[in-house]
Amino acid sequence: MESRKDMVVFLDGGQLGTLVGKRVSNLSEAVGSPLPEPPEKMVPRGCLSPRAVPPATRERGGGGPEEEPVDGLAGSAAGPGAEPQVAGAAMLGPGPPAPSVDSLSGQGQPSSSDTESDFYEEIEVSCTPDCATGNAEYQHSKGSGSEALVGSPNGGSETPKSNGGSGGGGSQGTLACSASDQMRRYRTAFTREQIARLEKEFYRENYVSRPRRCELAAALNLPETTIKVWFQNRRMKDKRQRLAMTWPHPADPAFYTYMMSHAAAAGGLPYPFPSHLPLPYYSPVGLGAASAASAAASPFSGSLRPLDTFRVLSQPYPRPELLCAFRHPPLYPGPAHGLGASAGGPCSCLACHSGPANGLAPRAAAASDFTCASTSRSDSFLTFAPSVLSKASSVALDQREEVPLTR
């Protein structure tokens, strides 16, 4: 009590530096502990952070008894606010606080850099919720590890454990991210047998029922959903091909009827349009005339009656056979003029050889208008592939007819 009263009296008198040094030295000699640390290190535990300790103190490492005594530091210009704090900390008690402060200062110095590195460690950032959760857990574990490091005297030994646990959480979050990124649906690789069976079924009926889908799924070892999607895509493909075929034809009713007559002659082909069969295009020669004039000049104007046209259009999905224009020798002469037919081979199109066997009325006059001879051909239209038209755009019409069909 006496010493505390004297300290208060001398604090009021202003003779602070020398008395603080004497009292502290007397207390340290009485207790038997080494000299206390400078006032910069005697900071409360709650304030211990990487930025609370000055850089000069960090460079010196853990302080020992060889450092400067408190007398010189207390006499320096530390300010009147820090001196009462030092005196009060020295007068608290001579027992256990001194070893705890020493152990904290001895092990807190190297651990301050660890804490700083923990605070500023980079963390992976991702947009998926799983990764965000993993990063949140990672940060939480990091924060708890740093708190344990500051609060406990043996925080340095607990640092690897906390780092290991947090690293495990981060790796789990990264694995979850990669697993979510790899969950993609790839295209089904159909075999030739599966494609042939599906095409055969589509040729039979365009819309397949669910029991039939189940049978196909069991027979082909495919999921029912895959078969359903395949039929949807196949119907859309067939629709696009039919629209591409019939797009330019309504401008010329006679030519449209002629083309649809070939579509009505479909029968044995598994695919509605073979890949080697190009789409028909108008010739630039016949585009200048009006549709009525071209219909009147066309030899196919009386080839089919309106009833036959409606009969052709009544079929839901026509499968056209090989076009007559690609079988005629005048357009593509030679044995390799296109689709394997010889130069003098017969033509089996409806416009040339449709008779009572095909369900059409006999028409001798119309048949005489158009035969397979090279003398009867029409200049009002020609069917060419786009590649042929692009290559022979500046060639005369007679030379253009001799261009072989490109597969």
Swiss-Prot record:
Q: Would you tell me the Gene Ontology cellular component terms?
A: axon; chromatin; neuronal cell body; nucleoplasm; nucleus
Kindly state a single biological-process term from the GO annotations of this entry: regulation of transcription by RNA polymerase II
| InterPro entries associated with the record | Even-skipped_HD (IPR052002), HD (IPR001356), HD_metazoa (IPR020479), Homeobox_CS (IPR017970), Homeodomain-like_sf (IPR009057)
| UniProt name for this protein | Homeobox even-skipped homolog protein 1
Q: Which residues bind DNA?
A: 183-242
Q: What does the function comment of this entry state?
A: May play a role in the specification of neuronal cell types.
User: Where does the source fall among the domains of life?
Assistant: Eukaryota
A Gene Ontology molecular function term for this protein is: DNA-binding transcription factor activity, RNA polymerase II-specific
Region listing for Disordered, in residue ranges: 29-120, 137-179
Q: Which family does it belong to?
A: Belongs to the even-skipped homeobox family.
- Please list the residue ranges that the record marks as compositionally biased, kind Polar residues: 102-114
Q: Which SMART domains match?
A: HOX
Which keywords does UniProt give here? Developmental protein, DNA-binding, Homeobox, Nucleus
Q: Where does the record place it?
A: Nucleus
